[in-house]
UniProtKB/Swiss-Prot annotation:
Keywords: G-protein coupled receptor, Glycoprotein, Membrane, Receptor, Sensory transduction, Taste, Transducer, Transmembrane, Transmembrane helix. Putative taste receptor which may play a role in the perception of bitterness. This is Taste receptor type 2 member 102. Its main location: membrane. Belongs to the G-protein coupled receptor T2R family. It comes from the Eukaryota. It comes from Mus musculus (Mouse). Glycans are attached at N161. GO terms for biological process: detection of chemical stimulus involved in sensory perception of bitter taste. It is found in: Membrane. Several bitter taste receptors are expressed in a single taste receptor cell. Residues 31-47, 109-129, 203-231, 284-329 are cytoplasmic.
Length: 329
């Protein structure tokens, strides 16, 4: 077994690990917020954003997995209606995953940052309406993306040779469509997320200057909130940039028919919907407490320890308490 074969097998295993990890982390966010909704019959604004973001990312992860499977059997993938379903599902999941993450960045900015600008105070007062307006406005870009994708897909299908020998070109063409559409329609939301990140840094800088004037040595809750939000936002910006560049890598790899490079591109691409969701869990007090509770319960089960009914009820009550507790408002 040569070195390339070893790297290929290792990369394949890594893709499956990311696939499972991404489904578990996003599925946990969905389940946690669903239980919260069942208990309280309502969800806060940030919980709604996290819930829909996790659902869109689960779909995106499965789309990437379908693309990965097509490398081993291309002839069973890009055929007629299957191409349309996979392609347009990718467009939808990628669109909502990006815009929901952007609205999350805007949410953190307006809820945490301390600014005296009139426009900032106005947007902060109408935060819910702003988030809804951003998502409704994003539908205009989604419509334009779908219309352009339909025209490109019809043109592509019209001139396409359905023989198996051209399937590698089909995959390269499909990646090219996704890459350039993604580049065109992700500029605005990515810019908004970047601006939110920079403004939050500016707010943190002003806050730290204020703390120095009153000689506080320990980090106050506002500083901790700033740092937590910045970690979430910078991880999103970096991972989405890697996600975008991975499509470029995959496109170049398929042009040169390099399966190993294509798989490496997919590994990088899966990091965005998988790893960032884990960072969201660690940065959200409610989700973090619930996850620790579940891990503690799972560890006891795996060790084969005898859990009494009282102790089991105690764990269950604690989990319900964690779910019922709201995170950042």
């Amino acid at each position: 077994m040569n070195m390339e074969s070893v790297l290929h097998n290792f990369a394949t295993v890594l893709i499956y690990v990311e696939f499972i990890f991404g489904n578990l982390s996003n599925g946990f966010i969905v389940l946690s917020n669903f239980l919260d909704w069942v208990i309280k019959q309502k969800l806060s604004l940030i919980d709604k954003i996290l819930l829909t973001l996790a659902i869109s990312r689960i779909t995106l992860i499965w789309e990437i997995y379908a693309w990965f499977k097509s490398l081993y059997d291309p002839s069973s993938f890009l055929i007629g209606i299957e191409f349309q379903i996979i392609y347009f599902s990718w467009v939808l999941s990628s669109h909502f995953s990006l815009w929901l993450a952007t609205t999350l960045s805007v949410f953190y900015l307006l809820r945490i940052a301390n600014c005296s600008w009139q426009i900032f105070l106005y947007l902060k007062w109408r935060l819910k309406q702003l988030i809804v307006g951003m998502l409704l406005g994003s539908l205009v870009f989604l419509l334009g993306n779908l219309m352009q994708s339909m025209l490109e897909e019809r043109f592509y299908q019209y001139g396409r040779n359905t023989s198996v020998n051209t399937m590698s070109n089909d995959l390269a063409m499909w990646t090219e469509l996704i890459f350039f559409n993604m580049a065109m329609f992700s500029v605005i939301p990515f810019t908004l997320a970047l601006i939110s990140f920079l403004l939050l840094i500016f707010s943190l800088w002003k806050h730290l200057q204020k703390m120095q004037l009153i000689s506080r040595r320990h980090r106050d809750p506002s500083t901790k909130a700033h740092m937590n939000a910045l970690r979430i936002m910078v991880s999103f910006l970096l991972l989405y940039t890697m996600h975008f560049l991975s499509l470029l890598i995959s496109w170049i790899a398929q042009k040169h028919q390099s399966e190993l490079a294509d798989i490496i591109g997919m590994i990088t691409e899966l990091m965005y919907p998988s790893v960032h969701s884990c960072i969201l869990i660690l940065g959200n007090s409610k989700l973090k407490q619930t996850s620790l509770c579940m891990l503690r319960h799972l560890r006891c089960r795996l060790k084969g320890e005898n859990i009494t009914i009282a102790y089991s009820n105690q764990i269950t009550s604690f989990c319900v308490f964690c779910v019922a507790n709201k995170s950042m408002r």
